[in-house]
Design a protein with these regions (language model features):
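Secondary-structure edge/capping motif, primarily at the C-terminal ends of alpha-helices
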Residues: 108-115, 134, 138, 173-177, ...
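A cross-kingdom marker for long, charged
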Residues: 227-293
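C-terminal motif of bacterial Sec signal peptides marking the signal peptidase cleavage site
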Residues: 18-21
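Extended amphipathic alpha-helical interaction segments
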Residues: 154-238
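Bacterial N-terminal signal peptides that target proteins for export
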Residues: 2-9
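Alpha-helical rod/repeat scaffolding segments in eukaryotic adaptors/tethers
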Residues: 87-94, 110-120, 124, 145, ...
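Bacterial signal peptide processing site
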Residues: 23-26
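N-terminal Sec/ER secretory leader and immediately downstream segment
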Residues: 32-147
Length: 293
């Protein structure tokens, strides 16, 4: 079995841009600036993974791509969209703990980027709690991250610095400790939660915005399914997750509006009908319920 390079995007970086609601130009510039400055480091980090397909190479989206998507979506904070913290106690399997670590990390970023620091502190603590179950506890124990976070509540620049520090530590720790499969699974959890938040926020308000969001995210979904399919230990839960995401992608590709675009489709220009938006959105919400319950 050959090893192929898995160029895995720093997970917090993805989370920030997959759910962030950029409510002001200054906030957008701050986050984009931090991401651009870390670009050189991204290029030097890669994670290898044992793959079933020797020609497979998983390339997640760049931070700029994700930021562009969210600028168009302009999602605002809504109460009750994040995963309940109490749910952390019901996740007993390694798979559930790993994928919901991604969900909670996504919720953390959603709260931080919307200045909901009290809620963010709670999600940081639950992420730390769950990290102990999946082999990432040392990341949250180092540098007194929780204490630093609490001391800097209200200062988004400092909070963002802490999150970017976590992202780099996570990437290095996974690489150094051979925890590669974890990254693909919690990346999938973060993606599902980001889509859940985006769908809830936009659905019924602006079909054009959600059309663009869904269309661009389908490209990411295809990469995720390839990443999940490349994991060597194909458990039933993992296969079910992969199949479910593939069902969403297939349903999207079979929409009338998508088929009308033909082979040279430009996903940015796809305008879905309202009933098509509802169809895909309901599948995403069902998928999110499946992984969090």
């Amino acid at each position: 079995m050959k090893k192929r390079s898995l160029h895995f995007l720093y997970f917090i970086c993805f989370l920030v841009f997959s759910v962030v609601s950029c409510n002001s130009e200054n906030k957008e510039e701050t986050i984009l600036s931090k991401t651009e400055n870390s670009g050189d480091e991204d290029a030097t980090h890669s994670i290898e993974i044992d793959t079933i397909d020797p020609d497979f190479e998983f390339m997640p989206p760049s931070p700029i791509q994700i930021a562009s998507i969210l600028k168009k979506a302009n999602m605002s904070y809504e109460e009750g969209l994040t995963n309940k913290i109490s749910n952390a106690d019901i996740y007993s399997t390694k798979f559930k703990q790993t994928i919901n670590f991604g969900v909670y990390a996504c919720d953390l970023a959603y709260c931080v980027t919307n200045d909901k620091y009290e809620e963010a502190g709670k999600y940081l603590k639950v992420a730390k709690k769950m990290s102990a179950n999946i082999g990432l506890e040392s990341i949250f124990q180092s540098d007194h991250l929780v204490e630093r976070f609490e001391k800097n509540i209200g200062n988004q620049d400092s909070i963002m610095d802490i999150l970017f520090h976590v992202q780099m530590m996570t990437d290095d720790y996974i690489h150094d400790n051979d925890l590669r499969d974890l990254s693909v699974i919690y990346f999938a959890g973060a993606w599902v939660e980001g889509m859940n938040i985006g769908t809830h926020t936009i659905l019924g308000n602006d079909d054009h915005k959600i059309s663009v969001l869904l269309s661009e995210q389908m490209t990411i979904a295809r990469s995720i399914t390839k990443g999940l399919g490349a994991v060597k230990n194909q458990t039933d839960d993992l296969v079910d997750l992969t199949d479910h995401i593939e069902e969403v992608v297939d349903a999207y590709n079979n929409l009338w509006s998508v088929k009308q675009e033909g082979e040279n489709i430009d996903y940015l220009d796809v305008e879905l009908k309202h009933e098509e938006v509802v169809t895909i959105s309901e599948m995403i919400l069902e998928l999110r319920e499946e992984i969090t319950m």
